[in-house]
């Protein structure tokens, strides 16, 4: 379709999107065939530039604050028109995709991007249906115009870029953002608001299935191991980041994966390694003189990424869904070296740690956090993406866990034997051993040891994991230093949890001083 002197490219094939991106100088090819692009000064999400339109139909249901920032409806309309006019004056790309693999819960989305590579990214991460919108639902629009520059004084934005969600109009406006992760997380936020009304728990988690049909969920912030640990050659991948849990089903909200690439190796992450080929997008990955990706080079960012469709994963769930989970794993990257490699949680502890979302920002996906790592609490293991009050998601989680009798575990992928800079990080093989034990059922009914202060129960033995690692105090040379660190971490948990209005049973399930 042609408008004035420009062309609208609609539903191009992957091959054609790659060709357009190369012809327009948007990226180059790696030796694997993946398209390599740079995103400029924004190499992660920009949470200070994310807004939700404040309008009557949803205003009372949203937890407004520093994460969910209000944007005036009239300002949104003016800015949408301005960005759309800017985009319509030049070539752009349109694809029709779905968000949500379950037939009852998909959203039809018209995705419009200024660049070919961001359209390819959307085709990697969203679902490319055999038939678009068979149920005839109202369509969502994503308008992503990377080279538009917002003017805060005129547009009401925080900077030269913005991400704005309008639930009433079913629109997502992304302007001035070359980092493509904003697009997937915006639609995740949309589903995170909509799904609870349908009695579905939206989750920032990965999911996979065993040969026997058993499903495991991996909750966790970026860098804690969701993508790596769920990409298991012995199991079928459902997805690596965004899922819904309804009665009888866990389904992927997406159709692809968005893997961190820092220090990626074929040995430790063979599934991801093999998926980075023609049709995949590498963001902010440095190539050597032979067009070979140097995943150890962090000169552009520690948050280098690979986007690829699930079709690039040989062993996957064909329909992007599975049954309810036998095992629910909360991944935490503990910088203090206090938490054990695995703890077995009861329902109240599950609610406590889900609401707390304790972990570290590791090679953070957020702008302004720098390359360093620091401890953080992120409610629901994904606070930036959940528009409703946290308690609503926690109630749904407990309802689902009780309904299916799912077993819940807290797994530390962080430090042992001392805090960051003193101890060492658990190796991926060690953590994989913990995960394998959980998935085999070996920890159900296992004999446990109670850890005071942090108030957790740890198994006394885990197949293929060194027994001395299981009680973290034993891994510290200075036991008194461990006790001091444990009290310090408990204090952080207690202070963070003061903001939650929950039952005494849930409050008592956390660390105690």
UniProtKB/Swiss-Prot annotation:
Q: Which GO terms describe its molecular function?
A: ATP binding; metal ion binding; phosphoenolpyruvate carboxykinase (ATP) activity
Pathway(s) this gene product operates in, as recorded in its UniProt entry: Carbohydrate biosynthesis; gluconeogenesis
Q: Does the keyword ATP-binding apply?
A: yes
Q: Which domain of life is it from?
A: Bacteria
> What biological-process GO terms show up in the record?
gluconeogenesis
Reaction catalysis annotation = oxaloacetate + ATP = phosphoenolpyruvate + ADP + CO2
EC nos:
4.1.1.49
| Listed InterPro entries | PEP_carboxykinase_ATP, PEP_carboxykinase_C, PEP_carboxykinase_N, PEPCK_ATP_CS
Coiled coil where?
none
**Gene Ontology CC annotations of this record:** cytosol
Q: What does this protein do, in the record's words? A: Involved in the gluconeogenesis. Catalyzes the conversion of oxaloacetate (OAA) to phosphoenolpyruvate (PEP) through direct phosphoryl transfer between the nucleoside triphosphate and OAA.
Q: Which family does it belong to?
A: Belongs to the phosphoenolpyruvate carboxykinase (ATP) family.
The subunit structure is: Monomer.
Q: What is this protein called?
A: Phosphoenolpyruvate carboxykinase (ATP)
Its gene name is: pckA
